[in-house]
Swiss-Prot record:
Gene Ontology terms for molecular function: GTP binding; phospholactate guanylyltransferase activity
Residue ranges the record marks as coiled coil: none
Name listed for the protein in its UniProt record: 2-phospho-L-lactate guanylyltransferase
Keyword Isomerase: no
Assigned EC number: 2.7.7.68
Top EC group: transferase
InterPro entries: CofC, Nucleotide-diphossugar_trans
Family: Belongs to the CofC family.
Any one Pfam family match given in the protein's UniProt record, by short name: CofC
Subunit and partners: Homodimer.
Pathway per the UniProt entry: Cofactor biosynthesis; coenzyme F420 biosynthesis
Amino acid sequence: MCPHALIPFKPAGPKSRLSGILSPEEREAFARAMLEDVIAAARDANCSPVIVATELFDSEDVQITIADKDLSGTLNEVLSQAAGPVLILMADLPLATGPAIKRVASTTSDIGIVPGRGGGTNAIFVREPAKFHVDYYGMSFLKHIRIAQEAGLSCEVIDSFLLHTDIDEEDDLVELLTHGSGKSRKYLEDLGFVLSAENGRVGVKRPVQPAPAT
């Protein structure tokens, strides 16, 4: 049985670095689609998803906790009160699958961690939450390794393409359109996004661009 899966989520104004190709409304809808893909993957791994949101939003059949501190502060408060193992997953991992999440939760170490690109932390399993705290700003991957070491906790770094692939930049959409199969890929395809190859590089294009924000 997998643990509770905490999924931090920002409903309003997400993914600003995609503003060149998605309108504000489209970015919010896309972020929701990615969240739903992550929730589905967590449930496929027999985890119980809990959304840690910056504000209340409509979501059916999932528990929502409102963050009353910054991300790290809120998650650390939850960790301090947890009665058992906890898994933290980012909400922008649309390639996540049940087996990939189970791999993280099945580590025999005290901590299992999947790094993100740019030094971030995309997924982290904490066997004994009272002995660990998170710090999600800056080079969080190295911070979490250090925090585990200082607490005397064993730590496994897990190599997972599906959980390593987060979506922040336009180029990241290539991986989603190539490997994705969930709601977030369908959302992009419904908007007209397709893969394109120019000068030997694969990218994405959208025949009709969104109107600029006013």
